[in-house]
């Protein structure tokens, strides 16, 4: 059963066609990859799916509900969230405070959020920080964490909202190579332990081949190929697209 359906979606910026007639679907409970050379339209597609960019044409359905004209906060409350290539954390707040402020994409003031914190929310924050390996650093300011730790914090912040589906934009970008396997393991656990569907943009082919059960490849704003990791790895069109981009 598909949790996300993208049908004939196009998006342009002036004369630049970022996405052209893209159709794809993501099955519920799966880990699916999105690859392609720089400038192929991957991040634009993610931004369109979560409501950041209005699409020019086409349809985007989440759990069979049309979401292409809904704003980001409404889509988030439906259970569709994303993380970013560059982290979106609050550097002057500690990890627990970051978790609390992210809960249900809080639209309340900081004073109200921190004036009376339910015990269950603090416990939930600590449990999720433990899950991503940051429990010992829960009282540290987020700005003092390493970039890799900030990525883990952002993941925990997203989990705080109990999404059904999470879009991750290059979760291993900028991370020390020795820590990448740990990120992969945690993402697999997010999928298996929480039942969250993952749709992942990833630059490192090794990572996406380990993570994804199915992979879509974009090139020049169009869907070039889709298949299993093995099929994608052996697809001459995909190989040529990457070599041609170098």
Map each language-model feature to its residues:
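Conserved catalytic motifs of ABC-family nucleotide-binding domains
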Residues: 162
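Catalytic Walker B motif of ABC-type/P-loop ATPase nucleotide-binding domains
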Residues: 166-170
């Amino acid at each position: 059963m598909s949790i996300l359906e993208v049908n004939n979606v196009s998006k342009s910026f002036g004369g630049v066609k970022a996405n052209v007639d893209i159709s794809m679907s993501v099955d519920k409970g799966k880990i699916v990859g999105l690859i392609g050379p720089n400038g192929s339209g991957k991040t634009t597609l993610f931004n369109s799916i979560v409501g950041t960019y209005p699409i020019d044409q086409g349809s985007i359905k989440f759990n069979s509900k049309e979401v292409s004209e809904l704003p980001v906060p409404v889509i988030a409350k439906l259970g569709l969230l994303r993380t970013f290539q560059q982290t979106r954390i609050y550097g002057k707040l500690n990890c627990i405070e970051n978790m609390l402020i992210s809960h249900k994409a809080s639209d309340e003031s900081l004073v109200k959020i921190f004036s009376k914190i339910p015990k269950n929310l603090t416990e939930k924050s600590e449990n999720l920080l433990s899950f991503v390996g940051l429990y010992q650093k829960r009282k540290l300011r987020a700005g003092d964490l390493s970039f890799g730790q900030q990525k883990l914090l952002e993941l925990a912040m997203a989990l705080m909202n109990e999404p059904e589906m999470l879009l991750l934009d290059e979760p291993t970008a900028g991370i020390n190579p020795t820590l990448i396997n740990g990120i992969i393991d945690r993402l697999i656990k997010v999928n298996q332990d929480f039942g969250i569907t993952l749709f992942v943009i990833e630059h490192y082919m090794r990572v996406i081949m380990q993570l994804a059960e199915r992979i879509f490849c974009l090139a020049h704003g169009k869907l070039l190929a889709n298949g299993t990791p093995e099929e994608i790895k052996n697809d001459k069109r995909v190989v040529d697209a990457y070599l041609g981009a170098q």
